[in-house]
Amino acid sequence: MLMVISPAKTLDYRTPPVTARHTLPRYLDHAAELMVRLRELTPQAIAELMSLSDKLAGLNAARYAEWTPDFTPANAKQALLAFKGDVYTGLDAEDFDEADFDFAQAHLRMLSGLYGVLRPLDLMQPYRLEMGTKLANARGKDLYAFWGERISLWLNEALAEQGDDILLNLASNEYFSAVRRPLLRGRVIDTEFRDLKNDQYKIVSFYAKQARGRMARYVIKERLRDPEGLKDFDERGYRFSISHSTPERLVFLRDRPMD
């Protein structure tokens, strides 16, 4: 079973990584191609394109200028440990042991606007480039056009490497839209986490993001390979709802938030 999650806007390059092991992104040449385009933008153009404050636009202009394809532990950090945000709070990889990282490296992928697809231990230099950004490039008007079929083909390679055909989608719609489902050589299982609000079960973004990260952690810690085991997920008060679910979409409900 292969999982995909979204990246995060918040990054942490101050905390020392809990493992020294690292790999290099497989698709750095494509990231370098995008970086050439990003370096053409002024801070003002970045602010307008990405709806950022002047301060954040300046920060990211500096990141683009400093970016180099020669990744080392001195100028980059493992992606799973560099990303911080609701999904990664739920995933909580800071307490992973080496066996956990081994399983995650084989069974988890992070979708990225700049890097396309990242493995957990892939070194990553800081950036800001959401998949939905309408950055015109040589392949089209946005990043969906830039990545085209490639992300789907790379996920197929990862599925083939582990001898499986199940892709567990724990990513947001923005990011999974970069995956062309008809090209996948496997079965996609979507997930939904709903909280009780005003007498109805609804998706609450903050909680849903944390739950997606928590499920990724659950799969890694339990070494799950069979999707049937996902139905036993009951962390943070969620429970599987057979009446709300289908074989292709697993729905989990919760009556009240839990710490």
UniProtKB/Swiss-Prot annotation:
Lineage: Bacteria, Pseudomonadati, Pseudomonadota, Gammaproteobacteria, Pseudomonadales
Cysteine pairs bridged by disulfides in the record: none
GO cellular component, one term: cytosol
Family per similarity comment: Belongs to the UPF0246 family.
Segments passing through the bilayer: none
Entry protein name: UPF0246 protein Avin_11220
GO biological process, one term: response to hydroperoxide
Cross-referenced InterPro entries: YaaA
Organism encoding this protein: Azotobacter vinelandii (strain DJ / ATCC BAA-1303)
Highest taxon listed in the record's lineage: Bacteria
Database matches in Pfam families: H2O2_YaaD (PF03883)
